Amino acid sequence: MARSCKILAKLPRVGTAISNLTNVCEEMRRHIVLATQETAPLFEEAAILMSQQQEVETKEKILDAFNNHFILSEDELSSLTSSAKPVDDLFFDALARMKQIHKDCEVLLGSENQRLGLDIMEQSSKNLNGAFQKLYKWIQKEFKSLNLEDPQISLSIRRALRVLAERPSLFHNCLDSFADAREYTLSDSFHTALTDVPSGQERDMAARPIEFSAHDPLRYVGDMLAWVHSAAVSEREALEALFIGDEGEIAKGIQAGVNNEPWSRVDGEEIVFDGPKALNDLVTRDLNGVTRSLRQRVELVLQGNEDSIVIYKIIGLLAFYENTFSKLLGRESGLVTSVASLQEFAFKHFQILMQDQLAVVSAEPANLTPPADLSTPQFLHDALDNLTSLMKAYDSSFAHEHANDSSGENKFSPIIREALDPFLELAKTSSNDISDPTSRAVFHVNCLLSTRDAISPYPFVCVTHLPQLTNTLKTLRTTLLEIQHEFLLNASGLHILLTALKPFTPPATATLEPTRSSYPPDLATISSLPEFQPQTLSSISQQLDDFLPSALVDVTENLKAIHSPVLVKSVTEEAVEAFCTDFEFVEGMILGADEARGKLVVHGDGEDVGAEEAGEGEGEEPQADNWRLRSLFPRTTGEIRVLLS
């Protein structure tokens, strides 16, 4: 109870304390409200500032990223455009960044702020142009001291060339300068090789200037061509390492440059860079000076030489190197064209030499007079000797080939037409001046036989000329056969009887219904012919008997001037056979005539006796018409064959 009283006594004080606390809270609330009212603008401003700070920070990051991507540092710009700075890795890195910046400007041009993109693109274009100009000048400077013979060509210049290829105009200008420099260098080296002994401690003491062999045209031309070939191979290998290596990076650069410069295309055609062709063109340009000097010297050598064999060997040498240079540099190369034109020049000179030789022979009548023994004339012998040397040279040369078409034409065909055909024609003309047909045919045959013997070992000549020679020889052989046959008939007197018996010769063709006047005529009339009168027939028979013992020797002697015993023997044998056939015909006509006159009776023992006696007694004279042709012309075909065998 007492405790309750104490609690009740303290309640007023608790109420007072609570009231005071309430007042304090109210006061504090009032102060808080006032403070809140006073600080609210500050908080709002702070929030705005914080938001702005975030925006600024974001923009700062964007700006930093933009600057890092689109803006080069001062060092990079200086390395890119300053001529005082070297072309090193920093330059190429800066150039790569600048090209990327220029490409990425396309993104800016697609945004709302195109002005920024245009400004940056304009500035990057200026920087790129300055960088490529710096690179172009640096490459030209390096080219002046570049040693292509050094197997370790600077990697930096190879890298620079690949980068410069993205500017085709600058790249080609650079190549022009390079080609001019190399042309001068190679021309100077060629002149040195021609006239000066190589210097240096390790020089070959046996080495001599090329012009030391100028007295030997073939070696002189060969040494010059060999030097040019060696220089072309070395130049191509060096330039291939310089321009074509690294998997065609230069080609890719040029293609990229062409794609970036569509206005440089002709008629809108797609331009594709051909690396090997460009390399061949560059090597050709480098050798232009050497090519001109080579052409001049070879032409002088050709003009000053009158040996057709040497000229032809030079033609073969030029043909070999034309093929070699074609494989190395392509058919369109100026060097190949020059060597081909030198071949044409040499062949024209060869033609002139052949024409001069022909003119010299034709100008002297004694040269055209056939020899007394009807042998091959000296001018044709000389021409065949010359041709043999030419054929041997071709047979052992690189140009030797099989016939390239159905006509058998080959690379030697133009040569033989100049070196042989005119002289054969001249020999034929000379033979036409011989009045005697036999001598004319023998002389012509000897000329053709000598020609055939000369060309027979060489198939590439036989294929074009042997058929014609063979046909002509066949024609002449027929002529010789007729001559030998005619000789046998004339020498034996048999031609008189054959001429008289011509009406009794069987016709080549017979009509289906022969008339009384047609073949065969009455054989009994043969004895009335003047040629078959006793005195004439006996004279012819005696002439035949006088001729037969030496007939074979005489008829062979008729063609003794021919240089082919085999030909003489075969022609004579055929002529003898034809003579025997003619004699057999005459013999048959004589027997037929005697039988037709009733003057020949053939007994069982084979001996011929008269059907009528000349008279009743032995001492009586025969009647004028009681004679037999057979008794006046007793030779038989069998006897003739034996005597002429």
Curated annotation (Swiss-Prot):
Alphabetized InterPro entries for the sequence: COG6 (IPR010490), COG6_C (IPR048369), COG6_N (IPR048368)
GO biological process: one example: protein transport
Keyword line: Golgi apparatus, Membrane, Protein transport, Transport
Keyword Electron transport among record annotations: no
Topology in the lipid bilayer: Peripheral membrane protein
Main subcellular location of this protein, as a coarse class: Golgi
Entry's Gene Ontology cellular component terms: Golgi membrane; Golgi transport complex
Subcellular location: Golgi apparatus membrane
Summary of the function given for this chain in its UniProt record: Acts as a component of the peripheral membrane COG complex that is involved in intra-Golgi protein trafficking. COG is located at the cis-Golgi, and regulates tethering of retrograde intra-Golgi vesicles and possibly a number of other membrane trafficking events.
Family assignment from sequence similarity: Belongs to the COG6 family.
Protein name, entry field: Conserved oligomeric Golgi complex subunit 6
